[in-house]
Regions:
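A transmembrane-helix-recognition feature enriched in membrane-embedded lipid enzymes
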Residues: 147-177
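N-terminal membrane-anchoring alpha-helices
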Residues: 1-11, 163, 167, 174-188
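A structural signal for short, hydrophobic/glycine-enriched beta-strand patches
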Residues: 2-151
Length: 188
């Protein structure tokens, strides 16, 4: 389910997961990163949840995307203990795997996923592949000014979906096997 700006009364989510984007030199957030975290902060302040989980490792420039988002969230009034970080992932699929493990450990399953509109279908697919039924909320923003740039983003996402399917199937099968196989016990 895709929501541009949820207008209905807030639904209680366990957490908002915010996917990272580029960090620029000097630890500056790219416009996409800033859009995503500010949208998540707005949703949290409007009562959709009390926790953020920011995800993203180190890209071309340090620090980790998650660290930059955490700093921005705290600067906008979110208590530090309410901003969880996953700072290892280097792809959307890795973010999904690592975040899903963190969420399961906390018993959280009601997730609002924040990213850009063009990225949301693939991001939701990645989280669904890990067994988490997230709801998407696209960060508001202007589409790319140049038509070729917009086409580039949509083409890249369209080509990435089949690749994710290839990556997701083995992960799903492995997780199913682990869930079905009895735990081995050793006898003294």
């Amino acid at each position: 389910m895709l929501q541009k700006h949820p207008e209905a009364p807030p639904v209680a989510y366990d957490v908002i997961v915010v996917l990272g984007a580029a960090v620029w030199p000097g630890a500056q957030p790219s416009p996409a990163l800033q859009r995503r975290i500010l949208h998540a902060v707005d949703l949290l302040q409007r009562g959709y949840t009390t926790y953020l989980l920011v995800t993203g490792g180190v890209g071309k420039y340090p620090p980790a995307e998650a660290a930059v988002m955490q700093r921005l969230a705290v600067a906008h009034g979110i208590p530090p203990q309410h901003v969880l970080c996953e700072a290892q992932a280097t792809s959307t699929f890795e973010s999904a795997l690592l975040c899903c493990d963190m969420l399961r450990q906390r018993g959280w399953s009601r997730v609002l996923l924040v990213t850009d509109r063009y990225h949301l279908p693939r991001a939701l697919f990645a989280f669904w592949s890990c067994g988490l039924r997230a709801v998407g909320s696209a960060a508001p923003g202007k589409p790319a000014r140049r038509l070729w740039r917009r086409w580039y983003y949509y083409l890249r996402e369209g080509l990435a979906l089949p690749w994710y399917l290839v990556r997701a199937v083995p992960v799903l099968l492995q997780r199913r096997r682990q869930a079905v196989e009895p735990q081995s016990t050793t006898r003294p």
